[in-house]
Amino acid sequence: MFAIIETGGKQIKVEEGQEIFVEKLDVNEGDSFTFDKVLFVGGDSVKVGAPTVEGATVTATVNKQGRGKKITVFTYKRRKDSKRKKGHRQPYTKLTIDKIKA
């Protein structure tokens, strides 16, 4: 059984036991988190939401809160001695999908 959930403005296909990285969630490590925005549930019987499937939830356990690889942003204006170097690390949450309830 698999499901498509929406989190952080993205749609992610998940299965039970799968580990996924999502945009940072305000949850402590080791806690459980429930996704209510389930757009699609597939398996033996298919359920398509309009826009979400009624009563469907996906439960996950938080493994880790972290930050991604550093991205360097460099902007400049030619011949003006004007430049700026900036770095960014996107925060993420690593989850393990425990249960899909449809």
UniProtKB/Swiss-Prot annotation:
How does the annotation summarize its subunit structure? Part of the 50S ribosomal subunit. Contacts protein L20.
Gene Ontology biological process: translation
Disulfide bond positions: none
- Pull one GO CC term from this UniProt entry: ribosome
Q: Which organism is it from?
A: Staphylococcus haemolyticus (strain JCSC1435)
Sample GO molecular function, one term: structural constituent of ribosome
Q: What is this protein called?
A: Large ribosomal subunit protein bL21
Describe the task this protein carries out.
This protein binds to 23S rRNA in the presence of protein L20.
**PANTHER family the record matches:** 50S RIBOSOMAL PROTEIN L21, LARGE RIBOSOMAL SUBUNIT PROTEIN BL21M
Family stated for the protein in its record: Belongs to the bacterial ribosomal protein bL21 family.
Q: Which Pfam families match?
A: Ribosomal_L21p
**HAMAP family registered for this protein in UniProt:** Ribosomal_bL21
So which residues are the signal peptide here? none
What keywords appear on the UniProt entry?
Ribonucleoprotein, Ribosomal protein, RNA-binding, rRNA-binding
Question: Corresponding gene?
Answer: rplU
Q: Which InterPro entries match?
A: bL21-like (IPR028909), bL21-like_sf (IPR036164), Ribosomal_bL21 (IPR001787)
Q: Which residues cross the membrane?
A: none
